[in-house]
Amino acid sequence: MAKIYKDEDISLEPIKNKTIAILGYGSQGRAWALNLRDSGLNVVVGLERQGDSWRRAIDDGFKPMYTKDAVAIADIIVFLVPDMVQKSLWLNSVKDFMKKGADLVFAHGFNIHFKIIEPPKDSDVYMIAPKSPGPIVRRSYEMGGGVPALVAVYQNVSGEALQKALAIAKGIGCARAGVIESTFKEETETDLFGEQVILVGGIMELIKASFETLVEEGYQPEVAYFETVNELKLIVDLIYEKGLTGMLRAVSDTAKYGGITVGKFIIDKSVRDKMKIVLERIRSGEFAREWIKEYERGMPTVFKELSELEGSTIETVGRKLREMMFRGMKQISSH
């Protein structure tokens, strides 16, 4: 079973007198910077240029610095920019400007696990991966709560890397919910697998296939949309709140029986075998190499798919129905 740490198990002492540089001020960067500061820690914000993020950091009471200047004074350097930006940031603005022995911290293991960034041998390298978007990390902290997180250690030169990772998790509020000890390998591979097989890839293709099947068989697109897209949120919310058995107990007996019997027919052994192929592509680094090439070419596959999807029937119908539903909700809220 996983090792889970709670707020009372963790001390801020290992990072109390450290300067923490948050690189990036987007969704996670802003949440981490504000939460760590509110926890009484010394935070600086490092950015590549003076833009919207720079102005927002100033509005939040920070004095942002250029990345090179921030890492030069930091004891702990936290990468909170997108995965595919981290390599160039590392090479151009961090590697040759950071203090010797400064810690390198990540919120996702991609660049370290696949050796895209190769850290100095004298640095502690660790990860804190909150299991929610940045705005929720911030909002839950302000309400006195927190979101769960994973922590992992890649290099432990000081002998205190785990304690520092846990302290940061406490500082951003995650320990209030619970912090699970993991590894860079486990976090990276499971995160990519989840995105590809269910959260983005799997669910999107299942939605499209079910919608298109109904429309091809003569059902009205608007009705098909409600049944295959709109009602999905109701089911996911039930699973989120009550688990799979709680969801099954909450739906009708007809839905229960149909879902239990037909679900196994749709997601059969052949689908599970494909999932194992996907997992092996991730483990071997094949997906990472493919994605890096795609990114370096300007993401033609991604933009082609987005363009085709945007003009599809499911999206055209969806835009119309969402406008209709939101208009109805606005009318209710105005009364």
From Swiss-Prot:
Coiled coil: none
Location of the active site: H108
Top-level EC class: oxidoreductase
MF term (GO), any: magnesium ion binding
Segments traversing the membrane: none
Positions annotated to bind Mg(2+) 1: D191, E195
NCBIfam families found in the cross-reference section: ilvC (TIGR00465), PRK05479.1 (NF004017)
Oligomer status and interactors: Homodimer.
Functional summary from the UniProt entry: Involved in the biosynthesis of branched-chain amino acids (BCAA). Catalyzes an alkyl-migration followed by a ketol-acid reduction of (S)-2-acetolactate (S2AL) to yield (R)-2,3-dihydroxy-isovalerate. In the isomerase reaction, S2AL is rearranged via a Mg-dependent methyl migration to produce 3-hydroxy-3-methyl-2-ketobutyrate (HMKB). In the reductase reaction, this 2-ketoacid undergoes a metal-dependent reduction by NADPH or NADH to yield (R)-2,3-dihydroxy-isovalerate.
PANTHER family per record: KETOL-ACID REDUCTOISOMERASE, MITOCHONDRIAL
Protein name per the record: Ketol-acid reductoisomerase (NAD(P)(+))
Native species: Ignisphaera aggregans (strain DSM 17230 / JCM 13409 / AQ1.S1)
This protein's encoding gene: ilvC
